[in-house]
């Protein structure tokens, strides 16, 4: 049988072992609690930072930054708002460029071909702008509506030389018409200015409350190889002048894109041509090549 001293040593050893195990378990438990608390703390902090960053990003796009485009790299690094905008614009540029490249790759090479450049390597500027010029007689406006194919009276009183605002670049001018030399898509425009002044004799024949009505119409025509002119645009308005008014001023402007061939001719005609004011700033006609 074991002695009493041996039993005491065995009991002490068991108690010591149990104490060590408890201490180890307690340390593991404390570490687990510490890790859990730390994880929850950092998760909460990250969520708050994410929410704040999202709010800052939304605030960046809800207000305008006028100096964004002029900002340097150093200023952008110091301003989170500008960083967000720059990243977004870079993403938009990448997507746009990728889409453009995909689109270009599907277009036949024939459509992508460009006309040869003239000598010097610079593209020609094809454009014309002619302005009104005070007419010496009524012969400057030629009636052209007798055949029923055109309306109004053709304006020939255009200043075609390089005086004032007028110029011609690779477009000819002949008999009040602009003659196209290069085929392509053109923007054509015209403005006509009307000035009405009641004659004293006529005003006596009209009652005080009565007004005189004039129908003002502007036409832009095109001549092609086809014998009859083709109307491209027209604009109209009914204008009333009061008997008590010293004079009335009205203008008509119109413009549009049209495909023109070589040797096509375009011109302007109007109704009530005797009311036109052919000042260069008031009445003008022109066209320029888009592509």
Swiss-Prot record:
Coiled-coil residue windows: none
UniProt GO MF annotations: cytokine activity; identical protein binding; TRAIL binding; tumor necrosis factor receptor binding; tumor necrosis factor receptor superfamily binding; zinc ion binding
UniProt tissue specificity: Widespread.
Species of origin: Mus musculus
Pfam families: TNF (PF00229)
Main subcellular location: membrane
Residue ranges that the UniProt entry lists as topological domain Extracellular: 39-291
Binding site for Zn(2+): 240
Role this protein plays: Cytokine that binds to TNFRSF10A/TRAILR1, TNFRSF10B/TRAILR2, TNFRSF10C/TRAILR3, TNFRSF10D/TRAILR4 and possibly also to TNFRSF11B/OPG. Induces apoptosis. Its activity may be modulated by binding to the decoy receptors TNFRSF10C/TRAILR3, TNFRSF10D/TRAILR4 and TNFRSF11B/OPG that cannot induce apoptosis.
Record field: transmembrane: 18-38
Membrane-protein topology: Single-pass type II membrane protein
N-terminal signal peptide: none
CDD domains per UniProt: TNF
UniProt entry tagged with the keyword Cell membrane: yes
Keyword field contains Zinc: yes
Domain THD: 126-290
Family in the record: Belongs to the tumor necrosis factor family.
Protein name in the entry: Tumor necrosis factor ligand superfamily member 10
Record key words, sorted: Apoptosis, Cell membrane, Cytokine, Glycoprotein, Membrane, Metal-binding, Phosphoprotein, Secreted, Signal-anchor, Transmembrane, Transmembrane helix, Zinc
Compartments where located: Cell membrane; Secreted
């Amino acid at each position: 049988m074991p002695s009493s001293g041996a039993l005491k040593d065995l009991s002490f050893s068991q108690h010591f072992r149990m104490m060590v195990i408890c201490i180890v378990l307690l340390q593991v438990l404390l570490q687990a609690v510490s890790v859990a608390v730390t994880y929850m703390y950092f998760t909460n902090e990250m969520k708050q930072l994410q929410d704040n960053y999202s709010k800052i990003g939304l605030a960046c796009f809800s207000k305008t930054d006028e100096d964004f485009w002029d900002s340097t790299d150093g200023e952008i690094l110091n301003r989170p708002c500008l960083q967000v905008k720059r990243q977004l614009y870079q993403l938009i540029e990448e997507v746009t460029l990728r889409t453009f490249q995909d689109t270009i790759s599907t277009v036949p090479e024939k459509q992508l071909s460009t006309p040869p450049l003239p000598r010097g390597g610079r593209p020609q500027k094809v454009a014309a702008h002619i302005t009104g010029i005070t007419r010496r007689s009524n012969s400057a406006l030629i009636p052209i509506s007798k055949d029923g194919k055109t309306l109004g009276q053709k304006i020939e009183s255009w200043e075609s030389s390089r005086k004032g605002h007028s110029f011609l670049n690779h477009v000819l001018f002949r008999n009040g018409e602009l003659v196209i030399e290069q085929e392509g898509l053109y923007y054509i425009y015209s403005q006509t200015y009307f000035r009405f002044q009641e004659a004293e004799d006529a005003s006596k024949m009209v009652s005080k409350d009565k007004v005189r009505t004039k129908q003002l119409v502007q036409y832009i025509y095109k001549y092609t190889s086809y014998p009859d002119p083709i109307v491209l645009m027209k604009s109209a308005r009914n204008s009333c002048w009061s008997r008590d008014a010293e004079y009335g001023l009205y203008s008509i402007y119109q413009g549009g894109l049209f495909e023109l061939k070589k040797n096509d001719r375009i011109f302007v005609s109007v109704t009530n041509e005797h009311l036109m004011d052919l000042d260069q700033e008031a009445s003008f006609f022109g066209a320029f090549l888009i592509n």
